[in-house]
Curated annotation (Swiss-Prot):
GO terms for biological process: DNA replication; translesion synthesis. It comes from Drosophila melanogaster. Mg(2+) binds at D21, D113. Error-prone DNA polymerase specifically involved in DNA repair. Plays an important role in translesion synthesis, where the normal high-fidelity DNA polymerases cannot proceed and DNA synthesis stalls. Favors Hoogsteen base-pairing in the active site. Inserts the correct base with higher fidelity opposite an adenosine template. Exhibits low fidelity and efficiency opposite a thymidine template, where it will preferentially insert guanosine. Forms a Schiff base with 5'-deoxyribose phosphate at abasic sites, but may not have lyase activity. This is DNA polymerase iota. It comes from the Eukaryota.
Length: 737
């Protein structure tokens, strides 16, 4: 069967559409579960209303959406079954959908109990058979009921609709035989007419519409609210325009309609009035979101909210287990009641979650069928995430009234069963732990101890290169392990797929952020400078090749940075670049007069001729400025030695304090906070920063062995001394160490 050609048929009378509506669905499912209820007046209760009832109860005056008290007054022998748990109805709906797929893949679900089917391809297939080609009377009822034959239309749709009635009859019989459920069916050439004509005769019956009587059928509907696609608000607007029936809408002045509704809406309403509908039957796949909401009396206590979320989460996980996919996002829905304004409004927050919170196992006895379950301890972690989202919506310092709570899982992904996924072989934990660069912008430096992430904080991490942005200390950074480092936009807060705790108001997956034009230009400039930097420097630029303590600290603001080239900079007020690369400066170490000094390649060549040229060195290191104040020559940049720092006199201590007070701090360090630190701590910080630069330069220029020997023969290196003790830098600035 050529189903692709069916989608292109939007002309009049070319398609054959079947609409199936299950009879009193919730109540019928309960009758199937308990056959003794078939002869009794049965109502399905949700909260304080009867959401639906069987035909025995309807015969006694009970209607849908009637209050429980009123229904029991009208029908004292009414049997009520709690229908708040939708799991049995959801399972039956899926079984119905699976059965319909045996006839055509073009099946569109409309709630639990309704389905559209485009059987055009199946009808064409049966038309090829001689027995079916003969014009046989349709099965079931026909509109109009005066005996008008389907052949009243000469476009050839009569035979197609007649075959469609036989297909609908076969489907209804199979549903009754295999699932024990009955339904009504409507057959027409479009979705709108098929749905409306199917309700003409119920329960457990079917009706076909003669195509040429579509306008008359719509006119006889009378009330506008019976037309699918016209809601309560639209009906009120039509009443204001003087139209209360379908017939009046058919005869309306289109100029008046366009002024009131606009061209598109006015045209759509006019088409609905005449039964015109070109919408296609869109095959339903697995849902993008699985959610659940619970309306309640006003809640104003946090513990009550947490308990209701716990119940919702437990029921929601059961639905995920049936679905078989793993969600990577969870959304909280709240309806807050304003007692002063006497109004309610909804608010939502969403957060990404780790797939590792779920585990997949094979169902026993069923080949190829997997079941998704929560991992050990995952429910408590998810509940903590939910409550954090709740506290982002509700100000806990003020009174609140919650009248509805909801949870939803989204961003589903298929998960392979077992541990043989290729990702398990390509990812190493050691590599992942170093591929992050911490920003120190807008941080609080008052805590002297590092905090280790708790288990629930780990659940927020969607990737090892991200941190929890709910705490301003963390800023998202990402790098690659390629020789050319990724440009980091210090002002970007996008990339929701990499965030650990991202807030959204919608459930759609956000697209990946595009690279800016300046980013592409800087990447091009970086590639042209590869010859200057050399292959070894490129390797050092990879975060996976460096220790975390060797990575310099970045800031989100515009600050001085290492230059990207060896060209000397003579400008003292050049703006700092917005984008940064994790790239050490192109410098070399020279041993002059028995001490280590920082000089650039170009400065080294001019050192003998111009001793003051170091002042224009392309390495604007803040440490250079601080050391230059106490050094005997402007061309020397001696490294501080721990041994000389430990033994100081009162006069030298005063000089050191003055020098440290005027130091220009490196990128990412607050100068005011630095000045408040003890003198020995300031000295240690400077030594640690310089040792990191030394290590980077040694690896860049291939002089690691020679420099190490030189350091060993002279004063002991600070990095070596600090290796035996905890680096104070990370005690004050890093919380994820």
């Amino acid at each position: 069967m050529d189903f692709a050609s069916v989608l292109g048929k939007s002309e009049a009378h070319q398609r054959t559409i079947i609409h199936l509506d299950m009879d009193y669905f919730y109540a019928q499912v309960e009758e199937i579960r308990d056959p003794t209820l078939r002869s009794k007046a049965l109502g399905i209760q949700q909260k304080n209303i009867v959401v639906t009832c069987n035909y025995v109860a309807r015969a006694k005056g009970v209607t849908k959406l009637m209050l429980i008290a009123e229904a029991q007054r009208i029908c004292p022998d009414l049997v009520l079954v709690n229908g708040e748990d939708l799991a049995p109805y959801r399972q039956m709906s899926q079984r119905i959908f699976d059965l319909l797929l045996n006839y055509t893949p073009l099946v569109e679900k409309l709630g639990f109990d309704e389905n559209f089917m485009d059987v055009t391809a199946l009808v064409e297939l049966r038309q090829a058979h001689v027995a079916e080609a003969l014009l046989r009377p349709p099965v079931g009822h026909t509109y109009p009921a005066d005996g008008t034959p389907l052949s009243n239309c000469d476009c050839g749709c009569a035979q197609r609709l007649a075959i469609g009635t036989r297909i609908a009859q076969e489907i209804r019989e199979e549903l009754k035989l295999r699932l024990g459920i009955t339904c009504c069916a409507g057959i027409a050439y479009n979705k709108l007419l098929a749905k409306l004509v199917g309700s003409s005769h119920e329960p457990n019956q079917q009706t076909v519409l003669v195509s040429t009587y579509a306008e008359q059928f719509m006119r006889e509907l009378g009330d506008l609210k019976r037309v699918t696609g016209i809601g309560q608000k639209t009906q009120c607007l039509l009443l204001e325009a003087g139209m209360s029936s379908v017939e009046q809408l058919q005869q309306c002045d289109m100029d008046v309609m366009r002024k009131k509704f606009g061209f598109e809406t006015a045209t759509r309403l006019r088409d609905l009035a005449f039964g015109r509908d070109t919408s296609l039957v869109r095959p339903s796949g697995k849902p993008k979101t699985i959610g659940m909401e619970d309306a309640c009396k006003p809640i104003s206590v946090r513990t009550d909210v947490e308990e209701r979320f716990r119940m919702l989460l437990k029921r929601l996980v059961e639905q995920v287990a049936e679905d078989g996919r793993v969600p990577i996002a969870i959304k909280v829905v709240l309806r807050k009641f304003d007692s002063q304004k006497k109004s309610s409004h909804r608010e939502t927050k969403q957060a990404n979650i780790l797939p590792s919170l779920f585990k997949t196992s094979m169902c026993p006895g069923e080949t190829g069928v997997s079941k998704v379950q929560l991992a050990d301890g995952a429910q408590d972690k998810l509940l903590k995430i939910v409550m954090r989202l709740f506290e982002r919506i509700v100000d806990m310092s003020k009174p609140f009234n919650i009248t509805l709570l909801g949870l939803a899982f989204s961003k589903f992904q298929e998960r392979k069963v077992g541990s043989s996924s290729i990702a398990n072989f390509l990812i190493k934990k050691a590599d992942l732990e170093v591929q992050s660069i911490t920003s120190l912008t807008n941080t609080s430096l008052t805590s002297p101890t590092a905090e280790s992430p708790t288990s629930d904080e780990c659940a927020f991490r969607s990737s090892p290169t991200t941190f929890k942005p709910s705490d301003q200390f963390y800023r998202r950074r990402a790098t690659t392990a390629s020789p050319v480092p990724m440009l980091l936009d210090n002002g970007s807060e996008s990339a929701a797929t990499n965030s650990d705790f991202s807030d959204f108001s919608e459930t759609e997956v956000e697209p990946s952020p595009k690279k800016s034009r300046i980013g592409r230009l800087l990447v091009s400039k970086r590639s042209r400078l590869a010859a200057d930097v050399g292959d070894s420097a490129a390797e050092v630029a990879s975060p996976s090749k460096l220790r975390v303590c060797d990575l310099r600290l970045n800031s989100r603001d515009s600050e001085k940075d290492f230059p990207m080239s060896t060209t000397p900079s003579t400008s003292t007020s050049a703006p700092a670049p917005r984008f940064r690369t994790v790239q050490p400066p192109n410098t070399l170490l020279q041993r002059i007069d028995g001490s280590l000094r920082f000089v650039t390649t170009r400065t080294a060549s001019r050192l003998s001729s111009n001793a003051s040229s170091t002042a224009s060195s392309p390495l604007p290191s803040p440490m250079d400025d601080s050391i230059a104040m106490s050094a005997p020559s402007t061309t020397t940049l001696p490294f501080p030695s721990p041994t000389t720092t430990a033994v100081v006199t009162s006069s030298s201590s005063t000089a050191t304090c003055d020098a440290l007070t005027n130091i220009v701090c490196p990128a990412g360090v607050d100068a005011e906070v630095f000045k408040e630190l003890p003198v020995e701590l300031q000295t240690e910080l400077i030594a640690s920063w310089r040792s990191s630069l030394v290590a980077a330069v040694e690896q860049t220029n291939g002089t690691g062995a020679a420099t190490s020997a030189a350091i060993a023969s002279g004063a002991p290196a600070t990095a070596t001394t600090a290796s035996g003790q905890k680096n104070t830098l990370y005690r004050y600035f890093l919380r994820n160490k």
